[in-house]
């Protein structure tokens, strides 16, 4: 309809490959969620005098478009690095049990385990990694924050690499919100029922700000 849309929550890269000229976002898309984990695995190999291609990767992903977008980007990176993809599993639809994948992980001993299953998948992964005493040098996943894995499973989650769109401790500032800590404090003051602020709220605030700035810049 030719009406600009500033969206705050949809991160799937497929939203931005359909030619939607009026769709804009304030958040990182799925292709930017977990590449840092593979780069870290490559750096770890190089630090001990081995090539990045020596890294062995295990992945387990939910079958939804969001997770499949993330997987597609990682598969390309794995090929570019020449790494070995030793496990490439799709998680069960109800996300309540990933012991089959973790049993393979125990047997194959990959250098990095990457998981994307939204909040429920993250919680299941953390719980079963703890229960099954899984020991992988690098474990990376999405939705750690929403699943509160560091609070609920502190032993298992120590050392997890967790993607997030926003954290209150970042020291950057702007004229609208001040620092992330300032905005975090203001949000809690306005909404005292929140003990912790969801990153979705920060994204939503940023989207409103961008919308305002765009219309002012266009004199619309």
How should these model regions be labeled?
Residues 20, 129-205, 218:
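Extracellular/periplasmic periplasmic-binding protein-like sensory domains
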Residues 208-220:
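Extracellular/periplasmic bilobal clamshell ligand-binding domains
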